[in-house]
């Protein structure tokens, strides 16, 4: 399913036709350039690689510079791949804009969540902790993390202190409230992961079909 790359600008409130206030996230989406086209015959699957955001050549590695020069395209800072059922409708250098979506569509949004640094188990995993009085030294500790004799190891996935946040997070079935093609803006109902200016990947909802079929070859 095709999508677009964008940048989170923040949240605001808009009003619908009946005067109801709706909290929306504003994303500057695109324009994105098709950097590569993959197909079943050559690559074993159908996909396109989109590039977003200008970048100076001195900030890129040599393999990246070679890729852009081979395609005769301007360097892009962010590259993301989008799987498709059929990639034959796309060509290298083609530009995709936010108008591939329309108000009322449902989308999936992926981005890095806000990093919270090192956190304990109570903040990171919502543990209850221990007693807070009567001479307790347990307080905010994790408690037992396994058994001595069996399995004699810590199970994979056990909640432990560590780096909280800064993970790829996807929220599904968010509704598009408004599109402003002249400003490359898309307004999404509710909140999305990540900090302001964070890079966002937007795709058609995988689990919910849109009422009207969009033309993805604009």
Curated annotation (Swiss-Prot):
One of its GO terms (molecular function) is rRNA binding. Gene3D superfamilies: 3.30.160.810, Translation factors. The keyword Ribonucleoprotein applies. GO terms for cellular component: cytosolic large ribosomal subunit. It holds the Pfam family Ribosomal_L3. Part of the 50S ribosomal subunit. Forms a cluster with proteins L14 and L19. Belongs to the universal ribosomal protein uL3 family. This is Large ribosomal subunit protein uL3. It comes from Brachyspira pilosicoli (Serpulina pilosicoli). The lineage of its organism: Bacteria, Pseudomonadati, Spirochaetota, Spirochaetia, Brachyspirales.
């Amino acid at each position: 399913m095709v999508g677009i790359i964008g940048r989170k600008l923040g949240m605001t409130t808009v009003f619908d036709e009946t005067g109801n206030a709706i909290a929306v996230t504003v994303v500057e989406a695109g324009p994105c350039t098709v950097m590569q086209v993959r197909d079943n015959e050559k690559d074993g699957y159908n996909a396109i690689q989109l590039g977003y955001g200008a970048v100076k050549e001195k900030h890129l590695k040599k393999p990246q510079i070679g890729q852009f020069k081979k395609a005769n395209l301007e360097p892009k800072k962010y590259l993301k791949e989008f799987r498709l059922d059929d990639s034959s409708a796309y060509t290298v250098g083609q530009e995709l804009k936010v108008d591939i979506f329309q108000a009322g569509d449902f989308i999936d949004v992926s981005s890095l969540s806000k990093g919270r640094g090192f956190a304990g188990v109570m903040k990171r995993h919502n543990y209850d902790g221990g007693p807070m009085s009567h001479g307790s030294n347990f307080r905010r500790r994790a408690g037992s993390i396994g058994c001595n004799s069996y399995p004699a190891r810590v199970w994979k996935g056990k909640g432990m202190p560590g780096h909280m946040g800064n993970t790829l997070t996807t929220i599904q079935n968010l509704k598009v409230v408004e599109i402003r093609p002249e400003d490359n803006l898309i307004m999404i109902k509710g909140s999305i992961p990540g900090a302001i200016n964070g890079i966002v990947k937007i795709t058609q909802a995988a689990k919910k079909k849109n009422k009207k079929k969009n033309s993805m070859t604009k």
